[in-house]
From Swiss-Prot:
InterPro entries: Actin, Actin/actin-like_CS, Actin_CS, ATPase_NBD. There are 8 actin genes in A.thaliana. Disulfide bonds: none annotated. CDD domains: ASKHA_NBD_actin. Belongs to the actin family. The lineage of its organism: Eukaryota, Viridiplantae, Streptophyta, Embryophyta, Tracheophyta. PANTHER family: ACTIN (PTHR11937). The keyword Transmembrane helix does not apply. Polymerization of globular actin (G-actin) leads to a structural filament (F-actin) in the form of a two-stranded helix. The binding of profilin to monomeric G-actin cause the sequestration of actin into profilactin complexes, and prevents the polymerization. Actins are highly conserved proteins that are involved in various types of cell motility and are ubiquitously expressed in all eukaryotic cells. Essential component of cell cytoskeleton; plays an important role in cytoplasmic streaming, cell shape determination, cell division, organelle movement and extension growth. Keywords: ATP-binding, Cytoplasm, Cytoskeleton, Nucleotide-binding. It comes from Arabidopsis thaliana. This is Putative actin-5. It is found in: Cytoplasm, Cytoskeleton. One of its GO terms (cellular component) is cytoskeleton.
Amino acid sequence: MSDLGDESVAIVCDNGTGMVKAGFAGDDAPRAVFPSVVGRPRHRGVMVGMDEKDTFVGDEAQARRGILSLKYPIEHGVVSNWDDMEKIWHHTFYNELRLEPEEHPILLTEAPLNPKVNREKMTQIMFESFAFPSMYIGIQAVLSLYSSGRTTGIVLDSGDGVSHTVPIYEGYALPHAILRLDLAGRDLTEYLTKIMMERGYTYTTSAEREIVRDIKEKLCYIAVDYEQEMEKATTSSAIDRTYELPDGQVITIGAERFRCPEVLFQTSLIGMETSGIHETTYNSIMKCDVDIRKDLYGNIVLSGGTTMFPGIADRMNKEINALAPPSMKIKVVAPPERKYSVWVGGSILASLSSFAPMWITKAEYDEQGGAIVHRKCF
């Protein structure tokens, strides 16, 4: 635990498409994890007696989603609505972590290949709107790799809104070989909703969508051999599981359990024409210098909530083995804490004494402007 008496302890804030993970450097897990969502009343005056609050953030917004219209300011990993994003940050610092920004350095995370103007805008907001004394922006996949104790490897980072394969050599991401796949948790939840309709269960409202997400997280898994698993599902009920809905009704889910995340390997199931996560990983490795490929094949690190399905590492291993040169040694690493490994990597980095010179200070920002971020964070 960090000693909160020490006012200079850094804040680590990982802004994902689906969830914000925030806390203090040196801690082993984020203190605050809440949905990246901002809600505003659909109709003026509906919420009388609630001090007419005009915006709700995170869990507060989720809980009132019936009367609010919800907006997600991060799309596919990249901030697209700065006003709402600022509200999320404000909520993070003042309501969740309850701190004074001017007393702490802050480490933020960004998606790989985040546009330059976005990094500058983020820097500007931290210094000008929140008055942080110093800041740093780390690439999510690189932080995940650090948290696994490596500095070289390829990270498959898959969250709620986007997936990336990021080859990293001695601590630096190789931008020319990074690939982005617009397929992630949200798409899987949507697909599960669709295939459950075949059973006659319909989920349309955002509240019901949350139920489907929960079913996905609790019951889905990845088959090592999809065809074989399908066969097993038709001949026996061994894979059937039950799930109790909030209203007490009990539903049964069978083949859907592995059909849903199969999309990660067979994107054609949802009508996409792109490579699955295994092929994208392989393509990323092939874009790298031939001399470092061996190091990448031997250090394939999974990261993010959408890599949490049981069976994913075995299947990934099997698929990469089928693509790679025959004698290549392949290792797929699925760290148990990978749901939060980006945050954990940030926590480790920001608490190293050797990291001190890396912070961008307010003085440097005042002198050089937002572009300073490209010189110090890469």
